[in-house]
Amino acid sequence: MTIQKINRVLLSVYDKTGLITLAQELKDMGVELVSTGGTLRHLQTHGIPVYSVEEVTGFPEILSGRVKTLHPKIHGGILAKNRENEELSSLDIKTFDLVIVNLYPFEQVMQKAEATEEEVMENIDIGGPTMIRAAAKNWYRVGVCVDPTDYEVLTQQLKQYHGLTDEFRKTLARKAFKHTAQYDKAIFNYFESVDTNKDDETELKFPEFNLLESRELPYGENPHQKASLLMESQKFIQHQGKGLSYNNFQDIDAAIKLVHEFQKPAVVAVKHTNPCGVGVSNTIEEAYDKAYQGDPVSIFGGIVACNRPVTEELASKLTEIFLDVIIAPEFEPRALEKLKSKSGTKVVEMDLEKMVGNKVEIKSTTFGYLCQEADYHHPHPQNWDRVAGEQAKPEEIDDLIIAEKIVKHVKSNAIVVVKEGQSLGIGAGQMNRVGASRIALENAGKESQNSVLASDAFFPFNDVVKLCSQYGVSAIVQPGGSKRDQDSIDLAQETGITMYFTGIRHFKH
C-alpha cells in the first residue's frame, strides 16, 4: 500500500455541502489551501486561511470569471509526476496533492422551463472538468474528490495516514471520470434537443444514457439474485413503506404505462407485470371500484396505479385490502393520513407525464441487447375494418378501445374482456390463443353477456369466435391476418358477433 502525503489542496466547488468541516480538518493538519471565486469567499467567511488562485498565478480572473484556473501554475502543479522537479522549480510552480472540485449545475439549469439559452451556456463548466481530468489522470500522485459524500472517508484517511492510499486515489479517479463523462453527456443531450439542423433519422439507434444514480436493491426477482436500479435521477416521491424492490419497479413500470393510456379517470391493478383489473369511469373512485370488482382475488397484494389524485374517499377504499404499492400523480393530505393505517403499503407519488415517455425498449439477451421502439400505437376506430356483423354501438366502441388499450400491455397470447369500462377477464401469457380466451371468458362468467373482446394477435382458427358466441360476447377487435381469417369471419357473421380488424398486432413477450 502506497501513501501519498497531502500538503497542498486546491478547492473549487459549486456544491458546498460539508466543505467547511473538511477544510477545517485540512487546516488543523497544516495543509495549505488554495481556492477561487465563491469557494474562496465561502472559506474566508468561515475564518479558514486560504490562498487565492490569483496569488498563486499572479494573474487575475478575466472575462467575468470565465477564465480563473486555466493557468500553468495550476495545471502544472496538478499534472506533475513528482514533487521535486527542476523544471517546476525554475518556473516557481508548486505541486498540488489533492483537488476537490464539483461542477456548475448544468443539468438542473437546463431543466428549468424559464432558463434562457445564455443562462444554460454560462453553466457549462470549463475550468472544473479540466482540473478534475488532470487530477484523475495523475491519480498515482494526486487525489481528486468530486462527491461530498466521499468527504468522510477522505477525512478518515487523512487522519490515519496524513495522506491517501493508492487504492482510494484510484477509486476517486474512477468516480471523477464518471462524473465528467456524465456532465459532458448532459451537455450533448441539451444540444441534441435544440439542434434544428439535424438530418431526419429513420434508423432506430440504441439510446445513450446519463445514469447518475445507482440504487442497490435488497435482491432481484428472487432472494438469491443480486439487483440494483440505474437511473438518471429519482423522479418520484415515496411517502411511506419500505424501499421499493426489483419486482416493485417492474410492476410499477407496467402499471403506469397502462393507466397513462386513458384520458378519463382510470385505475389499473397489476400482478407480476400483467394487469388483473382495469376500471375507467367519470370519477377516480368509480374507476377503482370497477378495477377491484374486475378481479377481487388477484388484486390482493398487488400494485394499484391511478391517473388522478387519490382523494380521502378513495384512500378509504384502498385501505380495505392489502396492496403492496399505490401510485398516483398526487395524494390529498387527508388521503395520506388514511393510508398510514396500512404501514406495509408503499405509497408513491409521481408525475405520469414525465415518467412515461421512453421511446425505446431494451432487453438483455445472451446475444446482446435487443432494442425496439416502444408500442405507443393508439386505437383509431375510424381506421378499423368491420369484417362481420353490424356497426357496433357507441358504448361498444368505447369498450373496444379500452380493451384494445389493455391487451397491448398483457403478455402474449393475450385476450381481454371488457364491459362498461371494466375489465371482466384477462387471459395472459398462454401458449395458445383459445386457452387465453377460455381463461378470460371464464373469469368474466355471466357478466360476459354483451361484453366485448380484444386479442393481441389474429385468430389462427375460429375456435375463439365459437367461445365468444357461447359467452354472449357482442363485439371483437383483433388484428386479422390469419390464413383462416375467413373461417372466423363466417362464424362471427353467422352468430351475430360484430368483428373488427385493426391491422395492428400487439405481441408482448
Curated annotation (Swiss-Prot):
One of its GO terms (biological process) is 'de novo' IMP biosynthetic process. It catalyses: (6R)-10-formyltetrahydrofolate + 5-amino-1-(5-phospho-beta-D-ribosyl)imidazole-4-carboxamide = 5-formamido-1-(5-phospho-D-ribosyl)imidazole-4-carboxamide + (6S)-5,6,7,8-tetrahydrofolate; IMP + H2O = 5-formamido-1-(5-phospho-D-ribosyl)imidazole-4-carboxamide. Residues 1-146 form the MGS-like domain. This is Bifunctional purine biosynthesis protein PurH. Its EC number is 2.1.2.3, 3.5.4.10. Keywords: Hydrolase, Multifunctional enzyme, Purine biosynthesis, Transferase. The gene is purH. Pathway: Purine metabolism; IMP biosynthesis via de novo pathway; 5-formamido-1-(5-phospho-D-ribosyl)imidazole-4-carboxamide from 5-amino-1-(5-phospho-D-ribosyl)imidazole-4-carboxamide (10-formyl THF route): step 1/1; Purine metabolism; IMP biosynthesis via de novo pathway; IMP from 5-formamido-1-(5-phospho-D-ribosyl)imidazole-4-carboxamide: step 1/1. It comes from Natranaerobius thermophilus (strain ATCC BAA-1301 / DSM 18059 / JW/NM-WN-LF). Signal peptide: none annotated. Belongs to the PurH family. The lineage of its organism: Bacteria, Bacillati, Bacillota, Clostridia, Natranaerobiales. GO terms for molecular function: IMP cyclohydrolase activity; phosphoribosylaminoimidazolecarboxamide formyltransferase activity. The IMP cyclohydrolase activity resides in the N-terminal region. One of its GO terms (cellular component) is cytosol.
